[in-house]
A protein has these predicted regions:
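A conserved helix-loop-strand patch within extracytoplasmic ligand-binding domains
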Residues: 1-15
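Conserved, surface-exposed functional patches that form binding/active-site neighborhoods
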Residues: 94-110, 121-123
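C-terminal functional modules
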Residues: 131-171
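Ligand-binding pocket segment of bilobal, Venus flytrap-like solute-binding proteins
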Residues: 12-93
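A bilobed periplasmic-binding-protein/Venus flytrap-type ligand-binding module shared by bacterial periplasmic
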Residues: 106-120, 141-144
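Metal- and O2-centered redox machinery and metal/ROS homeostasis
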Residues: 2-5, 27-37, 46, 54-60, ...
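Extracellular/periplasmic catalytic domains that process cell-envelope and extracellular macromolecules
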Residues: 7-9, 56-57, 73, 103-105, ...
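Short amphipathic alpha-helical coupling segments at ligand-binding clamshell hinges
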Residues: 120-131
Length: 171
């Protein structure tokens, strides 16, 4: 009822983003028997605009989003837990059959380099092995660049100046 709209009737509104994205929102909602109807905004910018509108009006919104993004930091969005992702839950066949009923998989930072890098540039190879950038690290940077429109090099310099101990450990 809290999320219901005229278009969703007695069901809550679940804001989907671009329907061309790979997503299982409708399947997850149906398979978990949740009282929501998915309404797609049509694009990422339209979703952000809808989020801006809802937050400004102090209206609740339930939506699919991902992290790290500036919107997560700007609005301090919280994750609504779903059953944990598993390979079994989201197999190709489950997706094909509309049987997905779990959370999305976590994206992990993967670092790739030439197999010759360790030999040809051992200092670069060592740096890449030590380098880490967490979601929280990125969430601290994204709003400055994406929302406040600060130049990316200025945002990066600010992070470098404030995190000397972090990046020196990578060298």
């Amino acid at each position: 009822e809290l999320f219901a709209t005229a278009a969703t009737g007695d069901q809550g509104r679940f804001l989907g983003t671009d329907p061309s994205y790979t997503q299982f929102d409708e399947d997850i909602i149906a398979n978990l028997d949740l009282p929501f109807k998915v309404e797609f905004s049509g694009s990422e910018p339209a979703t952000v605009a809808e989020l801006d509108t809802r937050v400004a009006a102090k209206e609740p919104v339930l939506m699919y989003w991902w992290t790290p993004t500036a919107a997560v930091s700007k609005y301090d969005l919280v994750n609504v837990p779903l059953p944990n992702y598993s390979e079994e839950c989201a197999t190709h066949q489950a997706a094909k059959d509309g049987a997905v009923d779990c959370d999305y998989p976590e994206d992990v930072l993967l670092k790739y380099a030439s197999s010759q890098l360790e030999e040809k540039a051992p200092e670069v190879y060592a740096f890449l092995q030590k380098f880490t950038m967490t979601n929280d690290d990125q969430l601290g940077l994204l709003p400055s660049a994406e929302i406040d429109k600060k130049p990316v090099d200025e945002v990066a310099k600010g992070w470098i100046d404030a995190n000397t101990d972090v990046w020196k450990a990578w060298l």
